[in-house]
């Protein structure tokens, strides 16, 4: 009945639904249809039929109650403000369902902060999940409360933490150094940075690269922002007002770079076309004009390892905090060129 209900909601066949949900290597030709199928599956709290799968494989049947994991977006009030976390969230939902788990509540920083102010509401939520997945850098003051409420925690981010819980990271510092080294190899010396500067690994990678190449750290080229598309556009407007313009711009994430492109398309100064590079490799980075050169952060793999760490801990396979670090990768497209100065 579950597959039929999902097929009805998504407007497709049961066989297509089954392939999307139960075959990890299946690639749906229609991305929008695939998104509808996963959304419908989450709406009805679908989990794969393990009994049917074990019967087919000949393995003994074991009745289990699906594990539920809440997901906490730690830095933004909405997924729309950072498309990296939006895509990571989609990968997580798929991975949870593939591992016969159920996505629980989706929490944001304003919601959790409000719960803490009400004191008792956080500890008496109507359902208690088996664990929680943190998306992004969690405020230090929330860690002890989360650890008291959730026995199993895993974090996913570009920055490592010193907190005592499992985490899957792709080093923001390494990603930033990779981006900066590429710009410098193209002859760029005046490189602006747009992004968070507060204990931020990508900012550390930015200035470390300048120092290692004996380039001056010009604070007038550093623009602290909250790393949204809107902030990227506003910051680029400020840059365009300068007399001396940077030849290249390093954005801490793709969302910021999209805002930079928005601004350049509206207010491009004659003859000024800066090289732009960023971090994340979101889907939209392939659709920009010019196509965005970026650093790939392996979102699907991060989601996969995060769920595995939670299940491993729940099954008492490890007790110490584990950190898995995945490599980043330079994706060269069209938005960077040799410096003409």
What are these model-predicted stretches?
Residues 60-79:
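Interdomain hinge and pocket-entrance segments immediately C-terminal to HTH DNA-binding domains
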Residues 24-28, 78-82, 165:
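A generic structural signal for short coil/turn motifs at secondary-structure boundaries
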Residues 1-58:
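N-terminal helix-turn-helix DNA-binding module of bacterial transcription factors
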Residues 42-43, 48-50, 70, 74-75, ...:
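Bacterial carbohydrate/catabolite-sensing allosteric modules
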Residues 31-34, 85-90:
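Short amphipathic alpha-helical segment that frequently serves as the phosphate-/nucleotide-binding helix
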Residues 104-121:
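A short, well-structured beta->alpha microelement
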